[in-house]
Swiss-Prot record:
Activity regulation field: Phosphorylated by MAP2K1/MEK1 and MAP2K2/MEK2 on Thr-185 and Tyr-187 in response to external stimuli like insulin or NGF. Both phosphorylations are required for activity. This phosphorylation causes dramatic conformational changes, which enable full activation and interaction of MAPK1/ERK2 with its substrates. Phosphorylation on Ser-29 by SGK1 results in its activation by enhancing its interaction with MAP2K1/MEK1 and MAP2K2/MEK2. Dephosphorylated and inactivated by DUSP1, DUSP3, DUSP6 and DUSP9. Inactivated by pyrimidylpyrrole inhibitors.
Active site per database record: D149
Protein name: Mitogen-activated protein kinase 1
PTM entry text: Dually phosphorylated on Thr-185 and Tyr-187, which activates the enzyme. Phosphorylated upon FLT3 and KIT signaling. Phosphorylation on Ser-29 by SGK1 results in its activation by enhancing its interaction with MAP2K1/MEK1 and MAP2K2/MEK2. Phosphorylation at Ser-246 and Ser-248 as well as autophosphorylation at Thr-190 promote nuclear localization. Ligand-activated ALK induces tyrosine phosphorylation. Dephosphorylated by PTPRJ at Tyr-187. Dephosphorylated by DUSP1 and DUSP2 at Thr-185 and Tyr-187.
Modified residues (N-acetylalanine): A2
Gene symbol of the encoding locus: MAPK1
Amino acid sequence: MAAAAAAGAGPEMVRGQVFDVGPRYTNLSYIGEGAYGMVCSAYDNVNKVRVAIKKISPFEHQTYCQRTLREIKILLRFRHENIIGINDIIRAPTIEQMKDVYIVQDLMETDLYKLLKTQHLSNDHICYFLYQILRGLKYIHSANVLHRDLKPSNLLLNTTCDLKICDFGLARVADPDHDHTGFLTEYVATRWYRAPEIMLNSKGYTKSIDIWSVGCILAEMLSNRPIFPGKHYLDQLNHILGILGSPSQEDLNCIINLKARNYLLSLPHKNKVPWNRLFPNADSKALDLLDKMLTFNPHKRIEVEQALAHPYLEQYYDPSDEPVAEAPFKFDMELDDLPKEKLKELIFEETARFQPGYRS
């Protein structure tokens, strides 16, 4: 048995990094590098399939601990075909020895970012990918969670065109009552997929910010290039207004922050660019849905259930096969304020269920 043979050999090395995942996981192969760890594929000697293993070493930084804990907490509670799951977590048996955490997930061949660099998508593919994104997002939003970092590289794909949403490190519980903030506070998610209200007066605590990101992703699938590639966040806003045109008086009224509102009023008037001029070969129904997702005013932006029911997705739409979460998700405490030592304890507890001999 390969596992037994490998057991005595000590941990495997990948590109100078220790990958201590034996004896169950062997035959490691490098896939890529994330912000705080390496991803490899490996052979799972129990289930007899290849899997992806992400090595995370977050414990030096409060922010990395926070993101790791958020991702683990959410993914262990979510169960959905269009959301990546966690199959196993490997870590040291004691908190003192725990320097790294290895997260085992289904192996997906590629992601939408890589695919769009090399392939022009047919309308059928665009429609099917968009449907799966929204089907996953319906479940996420039904749990009262916001992803807050939807972008092509966070959409995993395999050769049969199954799509899974990944990377919940920036996710939050929706909190519309605490959404208001000052003008242009730095926000962590990738700028190009950021809703305009985040640059203006919102913390991004409402579900509509994810819908905006999905609109940006749809536009990118239609043209193989990002629709709003801003260089900094004022530039980002200018890109958006350059296509959507100047906001109406009604849309300006929903911007509570006066500094932000006055900034918009100071800009020269811009007309909306028709979608069919930007995407002359696109399906007209796709452009109608795009228009409803890329709406400046978050209160008028389409919601995920309405988007699924849009005529563009008619061939796939089936509310009885678009499951929702059993209960809304709750973080027992706000993680932002906890020191990294406390976060490490919480990660240790959260991963205990995968330890040999675990009793809950």
